[in-house]
Amino acid sequence: MNNLRQEFIKFSVDTGVLRFGEFVTKAGRTSPYFFNAGLFNQGGTLARLADFYAQTLIDSGVEFDMLFGPAYKGITLASATAVALANKGRDVPFAFNRKEAKDHGEGGTMVGAKLQGRVVIIDDVISAGTSVRESVDMIRAAGATPCAVLIALDRMERSGADDALSAYSAVQEVSNTYGMPVISIGNLSDLFEYLSNAGADSEQAQYRDAVSAYRKRYGVT
């Protein structure tokens, strides 16, 4: 058992970011759980989340020089993670992009430190991989090297329509396409372990079978 990963799942449940029930995903699937990182919307919870990101990145052993947060959620995540890393003795620069180019002041679409060296892309989840693809293009265009993607939760789900499921998840496809690791604080296996360890009379225990069935249908190995 990885205590950090289990602590993160519990933290997400306790803050209401990770909920159980019936939810329709972007892919049109009915999922027994829903993870909404936008609900990490208070200073204290954001600080704790950033600490999870920072510690996970340190523990991964990935060598990096700076952070990049794609607009919009990635902006806050990269900024907060940079603060958390500095508090752990690793002071690194960070940058993020605007959705719309600015034609006055410093101009352009990039904000923060100059993109250079080995860059870690920070986001909440990977659904279709669009945000990562755009980030990789921007980083490479600046002459820097994307070296890893760091996300909060890996759903470990096979991509594609129900009648044409891929053998790979969106996370695996990103890793294979760009030849770099995708690191997650927690994943579906951690979530299932959390439910399996929940007491029989706990609120979460009732969702164990639903998550197990969902993982059997859509999960990757």
Swiss-Prot record:
GO molecular function: magnesium ion binding; orotate phosphoribosyltransferase activity
Binding positions for orotate per the UniProt entry: 34-35, 127, 155
Pathway: Pyrimidine metabolism; UMP biosynthesis via de novo pathway; UMP from orotate: step 1/2
EC number(s) recorded for this UniProt protein: 2.4.2.10
InterPro entries: OPRT, Or_phspho_trans_dom, PRibTrfase_dom, PRTase-like
Binding site for 5-phospho-alpha-D-ribose 1-diphosphate: 26, 72-73, 98-99, 102, 104, 123-131
GO cellular component: a single term: cytoplasm
Catalyzed reaction equations: orotidine 5'-phosphate + diphosphate = orotate + 5-phospho-alpha-D-ribose 1-diphosphate
Top-level class of the enzyme under EC nomenclature: transferase
Keyword hit for Cytoplasm: no
UniProt key word Translocase: no
Cofactor: Mg(2+)
Any GO BP: 'de novo' pyrimidine nucleobase biosynthetic process
NCBIfam families in the record: pyrE
PANTHER family: OROTATE PHOSPHORIBOSYLTRANSFERASE 1-RELATED (PTHR46683:SF1)
Family: Belongs to the purine/pyrimidine phosphoribosyltransferase family. PyrE subfamily.
Protein name, entry field: Orotate phosphoribosyltransferase
Encoding gene per record: pyrE
